Regions:
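Short, hydrophobic/aliphatic alpha-helical segments
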Residues: 30, 54, 120-135, 168-178
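Flexible glycine-/small-residue-enriched beta->alpha junction loops
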Residues: 64-71, 75-80, 163-187
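Metal- or metallocofactor-binding catalytic centers and their adjacent structured scaffolds
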Residues: 71-156, 160
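Short, Gly/Pro- and small/polar-rich lid/capping loops
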Residues: 12-47
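Conserved phosphate/anionic-ligand binding catalytic regions in large, soluble enzymes, centered on
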Residues: 40-41, 45-48, 134-155, 176-187
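Intrinsic-disorder-associated, low-complexity terminal segments enriched in Asp/Asn/His/Tyr and depleted
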Residues: 2, 9-12
Length: 187
């Protein structure tokens, strides 16, 4: 069947069929650990970096780690998702140790043992735990960092590009880069 599909359909069907077979064979990529730390972004502002490690087929040797940092924009609007900032003297109140603590405790405990390949479920679990419209309980910076780190870990575990993991069957072409020519806000 695999050979027939490869000959009949689009060349990327090989990737899709092999990926589906791998996923059906066993749910191997289970979330093992998520941890976070405070780092400085390109403007010198504190931001959250999360690390998610998943187990592969051989739990003793297959540990795959994804990492993501989520710096904020220079200006934020009142309708944007809420970042958690410390509000203390460190970094003029812009520290993110509270968000880091949320990842290392609440989010970590909630996600350990979950199927990391089910990105939608991972995201929904974090959003449900937060329970606010603007993500002000856990912090959008904490939630997004873990979500992207998980996405990166899963793509590495399957040995595919991130855009193919997120795009599924419609990920036949690499996304076209886009950039701002004119932009507002503070810089």
């Amino acid at each position: 069947v695999h050979k027939m599909l490869k000959e009949v359909y689009h060349p990327h069907i090989e990737f899709l069929v092999s990926r589906k077979m791998k996923l059906q064979k066993n749910n191997v990529y289970i979330l093992k650990v998520s941890k976070a730390r405070e780092i400085l972004d390109s403007r010198g502002n504190p931001t959250v970096e999360a690390e998610v490690t998943v187990r592969g087929e051989n739990p003793k040797t297959d540990l795959i780690t994804g990492r993501a940092a989520v710096p904020s924009g220079a200006s934020t609007g009142k309708f944007e998702a809420a970042e958690i900032r410390d509000g203390e003297d460190r970094y003029l109140g812009a520290g993110v140790k509270k968000a880091v603590t949320n990842v290392n405790t609440i989010i970590n405990e909630m996600l350990i043992g979950q199927n990391a390949l089910n990105q939608r479920r991972i995201d929904r679990m974090m959003l449900s735990e937060d329970g606010t419209d603007n993500k002000s309980k856990l912090g959008a910076n904490a939630i997004l960092a873990v979500s992207i780190a998980n996405l990166n870990a899963c793509a590495k575990a399957l040995n595919i590009f991130t855009y193919k993991f997120t795009g599924g069957i419609s990920a036949c072409k690499m996304p076209m880069p886009m950039m701002n020519i004119l932009n507002g806000g503070a810089h």
